[in-house]
Amino acid sequence: MKLPIYLDYSATTPVDPRVAEKMMQFLTLDGTFGNPASRSHRFGWQAEEAVDIARNQIAELVGADPREIVFTSGATESDNLAIKGAANFYQKKGKHIITSKTEHKAVLDTCRQLEREGFEVTYLAPQSNGIIDLKALEAAMRDDTILVSIMHVNNEIGVVQDIATIGEMCRARGIIYHVDATQSVGKLPIDLSQLKVDLMSFSGHKIYGPKGIGALYVRRKPRIRIEAQMHGGGHERGMRSGTLPVHQIVGMGEAYRIAKEEMETEMARLRGLRNRLWNGIKDIEEVYLNGDLEQGAPNILNVSFNYVEGESLIMALKDLAVSSGSACTSASLEPSYVLRALGMNDELAHSSIRFSLGRFTTEEEIDYTIDLVRKSIGRLRDLSPLWEMYKQGVDLNSIEWAHH
């Protein structure tokens, strides 16, 4: 077993060796290096064919028509293109958008930008387990609501939203439904021929493909229109201009092909490892599970250890690559906005750790992790005056802290 152990698969994944090998064939002079938009010679035709194959592989994983897949630079761009693109195109119908407080920053900040441009956004608070209350969603829908954006799997706590029912609710009212599926694609079954989802964002690097490539699903029947955000040569049916990065597209396609083949066995294996990890640490005193194991993705476990500072725990766990309560916001000392939206106090939010498992995680690594976490928590609490007071029965909420 090699240290450190990588348990941050929700932040990014290593490229699968099969994917890397495939990508190498699309870079150099002796490979297929052409521009897929070059129609006058075979270098272009071969590149275009490679892109078509990858587009099919992505469509097959999610039950879409390949013509509904638009390549972008990643899920952040896909979220921007979907939300701004739909809002701008349909603004004559209304200017009201609904999303949730626990979305990824790529959705929240895009909505904030639209607010500055005169749109109105309702941010729904989830229930304490992270699941959106569908009655609250229904109550928020208005005649001028044009778009709902609610993710499939949350990147911090792993809870799975009921996108099928939300889709039905939106379709019944003629509201466009966008889903950020970055964390779920290739991990949970998605069938867009059955789901009433109009726009869906995908990424390459969360599923063992390369970074810098993603896609947006744009429904054809009923036809959804979006306004392009990137202008130029009119690539991707006018929705996203820019020369297609063939090697990255091929890599994403291969990653999605592998995911389709291995998803079922892989998810059962990861669920087993995640449960093994939780069972190994759940009897530690004052440990809290954030999210919902039953309605959770099989590969994410978010846990708070009371009376332990998250930053010091990360330092103690230096043999583990994990993230503290804020994945994309790990650099800031603010507690995770996702955990705060669940109604959690700052102390617990600060002491949270996200373990995310993946294709190369082993049972041996999980057992090492359990042992290390148990020892580290014990050691840090031995040093903590707060833990000592808690053990003596002092109500820490009643203490007046002096501000120096």
Swiss-Prot record:
Residues the record marks as active site: 328
Which sequence positions carry the modification called N6-(pyridoxal phosphate)lysine? 206
Q: Where does it live in the cell?
A: Cytoplasm
Name the record gives this protein: Cysteine desulfurase IscS
Q: Which family does it belong to?
A: Belongs to the class-V pyridoxal-phosphate-dependent aminotransferase family. NifS/IscS subfamily.
Keyword terms: 2Fe-2S, Cytoplasm, Iron, Iron-sulfur, Metal-binding, Pyridoxal phosphate, Transferase
* EC number of the protein: 2.8.1.7
Q: Which domain of life is it from?
A: Bacteria
Residues noted as binding pyridoxal 5'-phosphate in the record, renumbered to the chain: 75-76, 155, 183, 203-205, 243
Q: According to its UniProt entry, what is the function of this protein? A: Master enzyme that delivers sulfur to a number of partners involved in Fe-S cluster assembly, tRNA modification or cofactor biosynthesis. Catalyzes the removal of elemental sulfur and selenium atoms from cysteine and selenocysteine to produce alanine. Functions as a sulfur delivery protein for Fe-S cluster synthesis onto IscU, an Fe-S scaffold assembly protein, as well as other S acceptor proteins. Also functions as a selenium delivery protein in the pathway for the biosynthesis of selenophosphate.
Its catalytic activity?
(sulfur carrier)-H + L-cysteine = (sulfur carrier)-SH + L-alanine
Q: Which GO terms describe its molecular function?
A: 2 iron, 2 sulfur cluster binding; cysteine desulfurase activity; metal ion binding; pyridoxal phosphate binding
Pathway noted in the entry: Cofactor biosynthesis; iron-sulfur cluster biosynthesis
Question: Which top EC class applies here?
Answer: transferase
GO BP term, example: [2Fe-2S] cluster assembly
Name the source organism.
Salmonella arizonae (strain ATCC BAA-731 / CDC346-86 / RSK2980)
**Pfam families assigned:** Aminotran_5
SUBUNIT field:
Homodimer. Forms a heterotetramer with IscU, interacts with other sulfur acceptors.
Q: Which cofactor does it need?
A: pyridoxal 5'-phosphate
The GO cellular component terms are: L-cysteine desulfurase complex
